[in-house]
Design a protein with these regions (language model features):
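Short, compact, well-ordered microdomains
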Residues: 73-113
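N-terminal domain-onset segments
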Residues: 1-64, 70, 106-113
């Protein structure tokens, strides 16, 4: 398990504007794995437990949430889109998708547009 990278944290921070409880989940999220699909990537999460802290359930219906922004990434002409999957009150994964371009999952410079 590893810490979230800068982009993953930025996405969750942006979503926390509409869904503030996400901020309470972020300290406990770790990356379980990153699955490269060739035209996208899944970043699967798990939670680390702290017996002293109770993480509130996200009051978000099961499904996917997004800010509907695109992300410009160095090396991709059309950038990427993303959705965050929420199930059972927890953040399960981020799905990144390209718009038909091959992608190795490497994130160098990026910006939200």
């Amino acid at each position: 398990m590893e810490e979230l990278n800068e982009l993953e944290k930025a996405i969750l921070s942006k979503l926390s504007v509409k869904y503030p409880a996400i901020q309470e989940h972020m300290p406990f999220l770790r990356v379980l794995n990153r699955e490269i699909t060739g035209v996208g990537m899944y970043v699967n999460f798990c939670y680390v437990k702290d017996p002293q802290v109770s993480i509130p359930c996200l009051e978000i219906s099961d499904g996917c949430i997004s800010t509907n922004e695109n992300i410009e990434i160095q090396g991709l002409k059309y950038g990427i889109g993303y959705e965050v999957d929420v199930s059972d009150g927890k953040i399960k994964f981020i799905e990144f998708i390209t718009y038909g371009e091959e992608w190795d999952g490497v994130i160098k410079d990026y910006r939200f547009i």
